[in-house]
Amino acid sequence: MELWVPQTQGRTTGPSRDANRRLQSGHYRPRPHPQYSGDNYHQWQDTHKNSKPQQDPRDDHQQPHYVPRSGEWSQPVSGADYLKGSYPSHPYSRSGYEDPYQSYHTPTPRDEYAYGNYYYHGHPQLPQGERVARQGSPYIWHEDHRDQRHFSEHHWEKHNSTFEANSDTQFQFTSKNPYNDNPASAFGLEQPGEFFPESGAQKQKPSLTSKSNLLQQHESGLSSSSYELSQYMTEAPEQYEPMVSATWRPIQADDTSATVPKAPMRFYVPHVSVSFGPGGQLICVSPNSPADGQTALVEVHSMEVILNDFEDQEEMRAFPGPLIREDIHKVDIMTFCQKKAAQCLKSETPGSRDSALLWQLLVLLCRQNGSMVGSDIAELLMQDCKKLEKYKRQPPVANLINLTDEDWPVLSSGTRNLLTGEIPLNVDTPAQIVEKFTNLLYYGRKKEALEWAMKNHLWGHALFLASKMDPRTYNWVMSGFTTTLALNDPLQTLFQLMSGRIPQAATCCGDKQWGDWRPHLAVILSNQAGDAELYQRAIVSMGDTLAGKGLVEASHFCYLMAHVPFGHYTVKTDHLALVGSNHSQEFLKFATIEAIQRTEIFEYCQMLGRPKSFIPSFQVYKLLYASRLADYGLASQALHYCEAIGAAVLSEGGSSHPVLLAELIKLAEKLKLSDPLVLESRRGDRVLEPDWLVQLRRKHKELEQTRTGDLRDPDLTPSDIYGARGTTDTPYRDLYGQQNYSEDSEYSSALWPTSEQTSLTNPTPQQPFPLQRDTYSERDGPVHMGTPVPLYSVPATHLTVISGSSSGSGVAVTGAPGGRVGEEMLQKHPALGENTVPQEAVQDPDGLAVISSPQTPLAPRDRSFSEDSAISAKEDEEGTSDGADKPPHPDASQKEKLRDGKNTKSSGFGWFSWFRSKPASSVSTSGDEDSVDSSDSEESPRASPPHHASLGLSPTPPLSSPSLPGASTFPRGTGGNSLQGSSNSSGMAEGVGIGGFSGPQGVSSEFYSQPGALPPPPTLQGAVPLYNPSQVPQLPTASSLNRPNRLAQRRYPSQPC
C-alpha cells in the first residue's frame, strides 16, 4: 500500500489542472476532508515522484476521507480518534497583542463536534495554493490579524458528507457553510482570486514537524465547551460582503507593513453603557454604531420614578425634612411623630412599646418647645402602667431589734401557738396599741417603745421618736421601715434615693422579676430634690442597665432624661449617637433612616427653645441622609439638607471639621443646579453659587490655611495684633481649644508653623520662645499675666552688649517693630518679692560686665539643648568659633567659655543631674555666680549688687497655657529699634525687652538696629535639640509672692514680673 506523502516545504509544482479540478496526468488527487483542514494542512504528492512513504505526524488521528481506489487499503478512523481530532490544541489568546508573530490555527468546523449539526458548520479549507483569503473572518486567523482569508472553494459541497463522483476524474463533497455557498463553484467556474502566487505570510507558516493540534490541545487543557466560547469572543465579526471580497487583493501594502500589536477590546459583546447623574438621573447609551449609520441613542431616566415603589424612598418622602425652625411648623412634626407611634404600637414587636414611647416623648418635647418637666414625663411614663399588678410586700427576714429569727406578729393571728401551746390574746385595737406605746414611754423605756411601735407598724410614732434620739437609732428605724416594702416597689426606689444611695432598681430593672422600669423612672423624675448629681447618676445607671439587656430604646429614653450629650459612632464608650439606635452594631444597621429622622426631630425640638442649639456630632449623619436622598432621586430635598447643614456648620465657629466641610461642598456642588433660583441666576456660561455655599468655601479655605500656617501675615507683629485687639490673648486660642484633634498628631503639628513657613529668617536653637507676658512700666498699667503661646513666631527683643570705654558702657535693647520701649522700662533693681532671675555676669578685664542671656523656657514636649550635654558643649564651641568671624566681643567669648566649663563638669545622669550635682566653683569668674550658688543660705531673694547688671525679664507663662507641639526651633525676629540705657555710677546700663526675649550674645547691634539687615547665621548647624528641664516653667505665676523652694530657686531660677 502506498500512502500519500506530504510535501515538506513549498508548493508542489504538479501538472496543470483544468477548471473541473482533474489532474491531467491521469492520477486522482483527493482533497482532504474539512476536518483535517487548517493552518497545518497536508499537501499530497504523486506516488510516482516519491515511492518512499513518509509518516505523517498526524496519521494516528487525522486520515483523509476519499473514495478508495482498487488495490488500495486504508485503515478506518475509529470513533474515539475521530472525536479527539476534532478540536484544535492551541489555547485561546489575544490576537496580535501577546505574540504578534504567532500563527493561530483555524478552528475545525463544528459539524464534527459531538453535538452534530446543532452548531454552525465552519469553512473547509483548501491546500495552500488554492485558498482565497477572506478579510475580517472571525474563524480564520493568520499572522496579521487584518489579513483574513476566506475560501471560495466551499461552493462545491452538497448536502451530504459522502463524495459523489461526477466523472472518472472529479469528485465533490458537501459544504454546509451558508456564507460561502455560491453556484459558480458548482459548475466548475473559477472564483475571483483563486490562483495567486504565494505570499510571505504563507511561506512563514509552521512546517509539519511542528507540534500537532491534538498535542497542543492536550497540553493546554482547553475543553470543547471553552473552545466554543472562545470562538464567540473574537473581535467584532463583520458580515460577509461580496463587493468587498471581489475588490480585495491578496497582497496589500498596508497590511504587510502593519505588524504593530493591538490590544483587544474590553468588551466583545455590544452592551449598554449607564451612568448616574448628579440630579437624580440615570443616563443610558444604547449600543448603536454611528459609524455604520446608526444614530446614537441616549436615554435619560429619573431615579425618583424608577425607585418609586421602594420602601426607603417612601419613608424619606413622608418625612418633612430638613427641619428648619423658620420653615417647618411644629404641628407637622407632631403629626408625623404620632403616626410613627401608632405604627409602633400596631407592630407588637418586643421593642415596639419602647419605640412608641420615644415617638411620644418627641411629641411632648415639640409641644413644650424642647423643655423637659419631670411631672410631665412621669405622666407620659405612667400612661400604660395603670393595669399593672400590685406590688407584694415581702415579710421581714429577722427582727431588727434583737436580731433573732422571731417574726413579728401578724395582726390577724388568733390561733394556738404550736410551740408553746398558748393561745394568744385577742388582737389589740389601734387605740390599745397606742396606749401601750404611751405607757412604755411613761416609764422611760424608749427602746421597748420603739420595738412595740415597729412590731405593730406604728412607723410614724417610731420614726418621730427615733429622730429625737441618736442618728444610729434613727437609721435603724428607717432601715426597718424600708425593708417592709417590696424590692421592686417604686417607694423603695424613692426612699433609697432620698437616703443618698443609688436605688437598687437602677441596677436590677429590666428583668421579669422586677417588672416594668417606667414607674421607677417616673418616681425619680417627679421627686427631684437635693443632690441633682445623684439623681442624674441614678438615671444614667438605669439606662446602662437597660442597654446591657438589649432595651436600646428604653435606655436612650433614660439618657435623654439625664441630658447625656451625643457621642460618636467610633467611640463605643459613648452612651448614644443616634436616638433609638445602638452604635455597637455595624454601621449600616446603626445609621438607619428612622434613627436619623428621630435624632433630627430631637434637634429641632431643642432649637425651638434655643435657636442655635445644633448637635455637632449629628451633622455628619444629616449629610449621609442627604446623600441617600440624592441616590433615590430626591435632588432638591437633598440640596435643602446641604443648606441646613451649612447653616449649622457656619454657626459653630472654629470647631468645624475640615473633612465634613469638604464633603459637604462636594455634594452641594453636584446638587446646586437642582435649585431653580440658581438656574435663573445664570449669567451666560457662569453659574452663580448661593451665598451659603460661598461662605462654606471661604470657611474651608480658612481652616486649610490655619492648618498649614498660611493665615499668618508676616508683616504684622504680635504687638500690632494685640494692640489692635486690646488684649494679650492669641487670636487662635479658641481654635485650638475647641477642635477635637488631640488624637491626630498630624493635624496638631500642622496647626503650628514650622521654620520654613515663617517669614523670619535664621532660626537659632538657643532661642525657642513661647509667648511671654508683656512687661509694662508702672505708667502703662499693671502687668498682663498668662498670655498663651501664639501659632506663629514672635519677633524677639534682643539684648546686645555695646562695647565702650572703660569708664562707661551700655546695654542696647532691641524691641520688636511697633513695640513700646521707654527709659522708664529700664529697671535697675527689681522689687523685693518678685520672680527675679539672678544673671550670670562675667567681669571683663576692661571693666565691662557681660550679662548672659537667660534661657527662656520651652513649652512641654519641646526639646532644646541641654546644658549638661557634651554634644551641646562641643557645638557651642563650634558656634563660638563661627561667631569669631563677626565683630568680636571678648565678653561674649568669655561667656561661652563659662558655659563650656559648666558643661564639661556635668555628670552623666542626664537632666536629673540638675538635682544631684552642683556646678564647680572653679568656673565662676564673677561674684554674681558665687551669689547664685550661695542662694541656699539666703532666706529671701535679694537684689543684685550695684556693680552687676540685672535685667527685668518677662516671667515664664503659666502652666495652664497651651503648649507648643511639634516645634523645636523658632526663627528670630529682626529688631527695628535700639535703645541705649542710661549709665549708672558703675558704668552699666540696664534694659528690658518688650517681648521678654533676649537676643544672642556676642553679636553686633547693627544687625538688630537696622530693619533690613539680616541676623547672623545660627551657631549650630543640624544639631538635634535635647530636652532641657530648666526651660520648662516650674511654678505658676500665682505663687510668685511665696518663697520658692531653695533647690528650685537655685537650679530653676524664676523670671521677674
UniProtKB/Swiss-Prot annotation:
For bias type Polar residues, the affected ranges are: 1-15, 201-213, 737-764, 1028-1043
- Record region (Central conserved domain (CCD)): 263-708
Q: Which UniProt keywords apply?
A: Endoplasmic reticulum, ER-Golgi transport, Golgi apparatus, Membrane, Peroxisome biogenesis, Phosphoprotein, Protein transport, Transport
Question: What is the membrane topology here?
Answer: Peripheral membrane protein
**UniProt-annotated stretches for the region Disordered:** 1-86, 185-220, 704-778, 849-1057
Q: List all Acidic residues biased stretches.
A: 927-938
One GO BP annotation of this record: positive regulation of gene expression
What are the annotated GO cellular component locations?
A: endoplasmic reticulum exit site; endoplasmic reticulum membrane; ER to Golgi transport vesicle membrane; Golgi membrane; intracellular membrane-bounded organelle
Localization per Swiss-Prot or TrEMBL: Endoplasmic reticulum membrane; Golgi apparatus membrane
**Induction comment:** Stimulated by intracellular signaling factors.
Please state which protein family the record places this protein in: Belongs to the SEC16 family.
- Function comment: Plays a role in the organization of the endoplasmic reticulum exit sites (ERES), also known as transitional endoplasmic reticulum (tER). Required for secretory cargo traffic from the endoplasmic reticulum to the Golgi apparatus. Involved in peroxisome biogenesis. Regulates the transport of peroxisomal biogenesis factors PEX3 and PEX16 from the ER to peroxisomes.
Subunit and interaction comment: SEC16A and SEC16B are each present in multiple copies in a heteromeric complex. Interacts with TFG. Interacts with SEC13.
Question: What protein name does the entry list?
Answer: Protein transport protein Sec16B
Q: Which gene encodes it?
A: Sec16b
